[in-house]
Amino acid sequence: MDSTLRRTWAEIDMDALAHNYETLRKRIGENVKFLGVVKADAYGHGSVQVSRLLQESGADYLAVSSIDEAVELRHNGITMPVLILGHTPKEEVSELIKNNITQAVTCRAKALEYSEEAVKCGGTLKIHIKVDTGMSRLGYLCDGDYFESGVEGICEGCTLP
């Protein structure tokens, strides 16, 4: 295939994005938190640009895939809470703490590992506990036979140093 025929791109209308955010905000109400997912460079639309707009518009949180994406936002003036949905190596816990980034945790072992590293750093790591709601992908299992152990794991994760 001739590469000159493949000139595809996406143009983002920031006014339309702001309008869409406002429409969603009105629909969900002020008492519901809004998390904008900007992983993978906001799906190719420019994570810093989209994050700035969401921050200025009053969104509550941002979510990214990796620590690199989160730190890039911090280095570009994004101060709102950022959640990493993917895995972060324990060696990066000090960077998470330094940049005030929240890490998703999917199991007890990972929560304990992160807690141990945070204690070594002398800091506190913010975590978000993922709960598997039925897709059987990631998170604490809290249904059927796993309900009791899942709830216990979540409670334990909430009290780690």
Feature map (PLM): residue ranges:
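Active-site-proximal beta-alpha core segment in soluble small-molecule metabolic enzymes
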Residues: D2-E11, V32-P161
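Positively charged, low-complexity intrinsically disordered leader regions
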Residues: L5-G29
